[in-house]
């Protein structure tokens, strides 16, 4: 396929085929962005009727950690691009697919391998690139974990090396928290059970996501790094509940944030969008994590930018020009399921959309859990404070209810 030169017609011999591995709410928006450019999209997830399944040309349900099943599906679908949207994937199979020239892996198979677990990316950032990070230690057993906690000191944060959206993450503040934190981490890890990272606390003023795009510069036809305006966010137990753009920060802190983001994404390589998470205190910045894909806090860009993070990702992976400029201050607020039930309904939608500048994305997940993210409210405003107030008001108006 001639990246950036030619796009085909979906469901025809000329089709440009993209396979997404992971079809949640972020994957769904990427699929929509790709389809607007006439791309044929295949959505893959571990459960049926995932949000992205509902809008893709074809949908598959497989265990993506099974290398044989993954390779067989890529071969059968003859995808030109394979785009991981989650961490729990057989990355060795992706490396084989890339090496054999079967498909291009986005951003690269190596980047996917490094970022699929917190150990790979932390060692790259801190030990190879020398980026400032929180103090950390890894542990494979409970005894080693207890020693790591003693080394780092209280308070500290414990995370499985393989998890997302705060699963298995907790704060250890005293000896009484040590064993419960280990058990919680063991239950929350997706794969590679038994290995955790223990991180020391960083005293920060705020957290940001620096969305960073590696895309083809139409003038030079070489890969160039682009930056979105910084996104501020609030997390509870490692899961984002609110985000806004732009996050006010000093010129020096912004410069340092973009330097860190540029260095880590350049080391990972490839094309696409990266969500670089950073801690900021005054002019000082610490690297936290990076995801080589759209970031959940970046849902705000559906309202704040002319090209959302999903459109930027679609364009970048296809070798097309990108424009990451801010259009307006905006905010997002999460809508949780509130109950454990399949096929729920939503009340209060009219009231939510009556909030000035507000919009909604209800993800269409087939099953709700009390703390599962089922939708998001978006809002624009004259400034970030107004946008945040509107987004929270719109989110609060939506009431998930039993459909029975």
UniProtKB/Swiss-Prot annotation:
Q: Which domain of life is it from?
A: Bacteria
Which EC main class describes this enzyme?
ligase
User: GO terms for CC?
Assistant: cytosol
Residues involved in ATP binding: 118, 159, 164-169, 199-202, 207
Q: Where does N(1)-(5-phospho-beta-D-ribosyl)glycinamide bind?
A: 25-26, 85, 296, 365, 372-373
Under SUPFAM superfamilies, the record lists: Glutathione synthetase ATP-binding domain-like (SSF56059), PreATP-grasp domain (SSF52440), Rudiment single hybrid motif (SSF51246)
Question: What are this entry's molecular-function GO terms?
Answer: ATP binding; magnesium ion binding; phosphoribosylglycinamide formyltransferase 2 activity; phosphoribosylglycinamide formyltransferase activity
Q: Which UniProt keywords apply?
A: ATP-binding, Ligase, Magnesium, Metal-binding, Nucleotide-binding, Purine biosynthesis
Which Pfam families would you find in this protein's record? ATP-grasp, PurT_C, RS_preATP-grasp-like
Q: Which terms does the UniProt entry file under GO BP?
A: 'de novo' IMP biosynthetic process
Query: Catalyzes what?
Result: N(1)-(5-phospho-beta-D-ribosyl)glycinamide + formate + ATP = N(2)-formyl-N(1)-(5-phospho-beta-D-ribosyl)glycinamide + ADP + phosphate + H(+)
Pathway(s) where this gene product acts: Purine metabolism; IMP biosynthesis via de novo pathway; N(2)-formyl-N(1)-(5-phospho-D-ribosyl)glycinamide from N(1)-(5-phospho-D-ribosyl)glycinamide (formate route): step 1/1
Q: What is its EC number?
A: 6.3.1.21
| Binding sites annotated in the UniProt record for Mg(2+) | 277, 289
The entry assigns this protein to a family as follows: Belongs to the PurK/PurT family.
**What is its quaternary makeup?**
Homodimer.
Function description:
Involved in the de novo purine biosynthesis. Catalyzes the transfer of formate to 5-phospho-ribosyl-glycinamide (GAR), producing 5-phospho-ribosyl-N-formylglycinamide (FGAR). Formate is provided by PurU via hydrolysis of 10-formyl-tetrahydrofolate.
Q: What is this protein called?
A: Formate-dependent phosphoribosylglycinamide formyltransferase
Organism, as annotated? Burkholderia thailandensis (strain ATCC 700388 / DSM 13276 / CCUG 48851 / CIP 106301 / E264)
């Amino acid at each position: 396929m001639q990246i950036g030169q030619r796009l085909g017609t979906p469901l025809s011999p000329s089709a440009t085929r993209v396979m997404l591995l992971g079809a949640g709410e972020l994957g769904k928006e990427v699929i929509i962005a790709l389809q607007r450019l006439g791309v044929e999209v295949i959505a893959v997830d571990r459960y049926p009727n995932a949000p992205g399944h509902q809008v893709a040309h074809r949908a598959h349900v497989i265990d993506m950690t099974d290398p044989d099943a993954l390779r067989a599906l890529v071969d059968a679908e003859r995808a030109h691009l394979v785009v991981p949207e989650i961490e729990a994937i057989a990355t060795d199979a992706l490396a084989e697919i890339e090496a054999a020239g079967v498909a291009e892996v986005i951003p690269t198979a190596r980047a996917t391998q490094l970022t699929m677990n917190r150990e790979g990316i932390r060692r790259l950032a801190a030990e190879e690139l020398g980026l400032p990070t929180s103090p950390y230690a890894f542990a494979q057993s409970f005894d080693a974990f207890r020693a790591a906690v003693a080394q780092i000191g209280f308070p500290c944060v414990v995370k499985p090396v393989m998890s997302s959206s705060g699963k298995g993450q907790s704060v250890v503040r005293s000896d009484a928290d040590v064993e419960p934190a280990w058990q919680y981490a063991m239950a929350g890890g997706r794969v590679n059970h038994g290995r955790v990272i223990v991180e020391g606390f960083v005293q920060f003023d705020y957290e940001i996501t620096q969305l960073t795009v590696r895309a083809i510069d139409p003038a030079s036809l070489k890969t160039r790094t682009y930056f979105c305006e910084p996104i501020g966010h609030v997390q509870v137990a490692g899961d984002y509940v609110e985000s806004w753009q732009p996050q006010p920060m000093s010129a020096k802190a912004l410069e340092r944030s973009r330097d860190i983001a540029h260095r880590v994404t350049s080391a990972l390589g490839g094309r696409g969008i990266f969500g670089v998470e950073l801690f900021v205190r005054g002019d000082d910045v610490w690297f936290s994590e990076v995801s080589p894909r759209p970031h959940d806090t970046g849902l705000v860009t559906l309202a704040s930018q002319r090209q959302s993070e999903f459109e930027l990702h679609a364009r970048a992976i296809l070798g097309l020009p990108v424009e990451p400029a801010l259009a307006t201050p905006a905010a997002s607020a999460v809508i949780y399921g509130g109950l454990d039930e399949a096929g729920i309904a939503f009340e209060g939608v009219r009231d939510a959309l009556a909030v000035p500048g507000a919009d909604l994305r209800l993800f269409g997940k087939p099953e709700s859990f009390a703390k599962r993210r089922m939708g998001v409210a978006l809002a624009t405003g004259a400034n970030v404070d107004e946008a945040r107030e509107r987004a929270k008001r719109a989110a609060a108006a939506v009431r998930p209810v039993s459909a029975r």
